[in-house]
A protein has these predicted regions:
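Active-site loop/oxyanion-hole signature of alpha/beta-hydrolase fold enzymes
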Residues: 1-41, 50-52, 57, 210
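Glycine-rich phosphate-binding loop signature in dinucleotide/nucleotide-binding domains
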Residues: 26-32, 157, 215, 219
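Flexible "cap/lid" loop of the alpha/beta hydrolase fold
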Residues: 47-95
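Conserved alpha/beta-hydrolase catalytic His-Asp/Glu region
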Residues: 69-81, 91-155
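Short beta-strand/loop motif that positions the catalytic acidic residue
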Residues: 157, 163-165, 169
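Acidic beta-to-alpha connecting loop that harbors the catalytic carboxylate
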Residues: 167-170, 195-197
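Conserved alpha/beta-hydrolase "acid-adjacent" motif
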Residues: 170-176
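Catalytic active-site module of serine/aspartate enzymes centered on a nucleophile-bearing elbow/loop
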Residues: 186-229
Length: 229
């Protein structure tokens, strides 16, 4: 029978597994000269893939509203978010994930400002429906992955890189993520979307697509930065 949805395993909700799964797909499809682009948690997968497997075959990397480099506040990462915030999220998901999703998607789209202007009630509801249909195990297990430390992974990113982030992102604040990611990758280009929430791929799709087209169509040469250095 054809597979119409993803499986819902009880283990493997970590970035090493995500990156390994992506690597298997790359090898199976014999991909070469491809772009790795990730949104939100997906940006962490891009970083971990590069950290584990390098850039062979990868021409560009794109991070959109992404969680790297390291969201957790620690002694050597004072720019991060207090751990109690993530613990509170886990507690809320465990107690009533459906109620949590309602508040989450309000901040995902900044509905208090953008509902009826850049996002419809139906689009927000569709996102809630998708989240509600996800594995309860995955919904809970993914929260700690939000504050994975990707700093060593980003150090291995040696391809032209684009970072796109909204300056009004309430889920993954730009100051703790996008701005720092761009500063850690030599030559990375940062595009800040004015008034953009977390889901700029929906609310500000035109701006995101324009940035992607300009970046990917610019004819960047993978080795250019290495030679320049």
């Amino acid at each position: 029978m054809p597979v119409t949805s993803s499986s819902q395993p009880t283990t493997g909700y970590n970035y090493d597994t995500f990156a390994d799964d992506l690597r298997k797909l790359v090898l199976q499809l014999e991909l070469n000269d491809f772009v790795l682009a990730g949104f939100s948690m997906g940006g962490g997968e891009v970083a971990r893939y590069m950290g584990r497997f390098g850039s062979k075959g990868v021409t560009h990397a794109v991070f959109i509203s992404s969680v790297p480099p390291f969201l957790l506040k620690t002694a050597d990462n004072p720019e991060g978010v207090e751990g109690a915030i993530f613990e509170g999220i886990q507690d809320a998901v465990a107690y009533d994930r459906y109620a949590f999703f309602t508040g989450f998607f309000q901040n995902f789209y900044n509905t208090d400002l953008l509902l009826g202007k850049r996002v419809s009630e139906q689009a927000v509801q569709a996102s809630w429906n998708i989240a509600a249909g996800a594995s309860a195990t995955a919904s809970l297990a993914c929260v700690p992955t939000w504050h994975e430390d990707f700093r060593k992974d980003l150090a291995r990113v040696d391809v032209p890189t684009l970072v796109i982030h909204g300056d009004a992102d309430r889920i993954v604040p730009i100051a703790a993520s996008g701005q720092r990611t761009a500063s850690l990758i030599p030559g990375a280009h940062l595009v800040v979307v004015k008034d953009g929430p977390h889901c700029i791929t929906w609310t500000h799709a035109e701006e995101v697509n324009r940035a992607l087209k300009a970046f990917l169509g610019a004819g960047h040469v993978k080795q250019a930065r290495r030679k320049a250095g």
